[in-house]
Swiss-Prot record:
InterPro entries: Defensin_plant, Scorpion_toxin-like, Scorpion_toxin-like_sf. This is Putative defensin-like protein 15. Keywords: Antimicrobial, Disulfide bond, Fungicide, Plant defense, Pyrrolidone carboxylic acid, Secreted, Signal. PANTHER family: DEFENSIN-LIKE PROTEIN 1, DEFENSIN-LIKE PROTEIN 14-RELATED. One of its GO terms (cellular component) is extracellular region. Belongs to the DEFL family. It is found in: Secreted. Disulfide bonds join 33-80, 44-65, 50-74, 54-76. Confers broad-spectrum resistance to pathogens. The gene is PDF1.2B. It comes from Arabidopsis thaliana.
Length: 80
């Protein structure tokens, strides 16, 4: 039993040691602002198509269909 406890303690210490050397990669987040798409017409039902249109036609970083009263609209996310 003592040998088993020693092995478990060694494994735990090794994991703590490896975790201490793990360097977290921090990328400064770029704040994105919402902007209704200027090129989308009608109700937005396909977020992937909205995303592609925002990126390719409007130079946005991202796009998705969001509910904005009274319907779903294509919203582009651009750097603030």
């Amino acid at each position: 039993m003592a040998k088993f406890a020693s092995i478990i303690t060694f494994i735990y210490a090794a994991l703590v040691l490896f975790a201490a050397f793990e360097v977290p990669t921090m990328v400064e987040a770029q704040k994105l602002c919402e902007k209704p798409s200027g090129t989308w017409s009608g109700v937005c039902g396909n977020s992937n198509a909205c995303k592609n249109q925002c990126i390719n036609l409007e130079g946005a970083k991202h796009g998705s269909c969001n509910y904005v009263f009274p319907a779903h609209k294509c919203i582009c996310y651009v750097p603030c």
